[in-house]
């Protein structure tokens, strides 16, 4: 697919699929269960007349396990590969997760990922901009994207996504490499809505770039299943984040209670909604706001079972009324999340 085709396929999406939590955990989800969920995502996307979107990572678990799952899935279901757009993160040290954005490191990351996945990758993204390589006055290292452009010319990847970038970086990279850019991946949820206030979302709208919204369920906070730090399994990185300490949760869960009591519980039985569906609906409702009409907000929840996929990908259920959307945003003006996105306890 050309970059234009990739952008068009992404723009058709309502919801994409994040595969990180299948493997980046103390005990990976068994392949058989993961494959059922992955297959259901493709099935639902087909029914809606567009490709599925798989968001994967070179470092989402040891020994390329995340990419191995994708490789084995398509080995089992080869006819489904044409129905999926794969976006892969790399460009980092797989052990320490520090950015490795040199030309040779990025080329090697792409080649490692292509080898692990078993072939062509539609979209590749350096997970974090390696600012250690920037010379004075630069906001991103040219060589990282020069390497990706070479990989596109060699036909091993199709386009570039940006990841965890700021407004200045988006503009600079778009100026130099815009013909290769397909989308921008950043965090957006009711607990982390910075992109709506720091210029990122407005810049994407101005430049016509879709916004891939990771962690739309607040890393589990918006599922209703987390009540205390003890609910987080040992070995899960969230356990050591300030946002998920018991003291922080007491304050952060006030938002969840508001959503449950003022939105979920007040819905009639014939139009029920879950907390997760509400959270996804809030992200997608920004597509109705005129100032963002040039972009497309696409949440990429996970889903380790068919039932979770069905819940998260129910496009009729994951909708809010304008009144609900406005009530939530009014509440958010006085609510402040305790703990930054990656702040340790």
UniProtKB/Swiss-Prot annotation:
Keyword NADP on entry: yes
GO cellular component: cytoplasm; nucleus
GO biological process: vitamin B6 catabolic process
Any GO MF annotation of the entry: pyridoxine:NADP 4-dehydrogenase activity
The EC number(s) this enzyme carries: 1.1.1.65
Source taxon at top rank: Eukaryota
Chief localisation class: cytoplasm
Keyword tags: Cytoplasm, NADP, Nucleus, Oxidoreductase
Active site residues per record: 60
Catalysed reaction equations from the record: pyridoxine + NADP(+) = pyridoxal + NADPH + H(+)
Transmembrane segments: none
Pathway annotation: Cofactor degradation; B6 vitamer degradation; pyridoxal from pyridoxine (dehydrogenase route): step 1/1
Record's subcellular location: Cytoplasm; Nucleus
Role of this protein: Catalyzes the reduction of pyridoxal (PL) with NADPH and oxidation of pyridoxine (PN) with NADP(+).
PANTHER family: AFLATOXIN B1 ALDEHYDE REDUCTASE (PTHR43625), PYRIDOXAL REDUCTASE-RELATED (PTHR43625:SF78)
Homology family: Belongs to the aldo/keto reductase family.
Leftover remarks: Present with 2190 molecules/cell in log phase SD medium.
Protein name: Putative pyridoxal reductase
Organism: Saccharomyces cerevisiae (strain ATCC 204508 / S288c) (Baker's yeast)
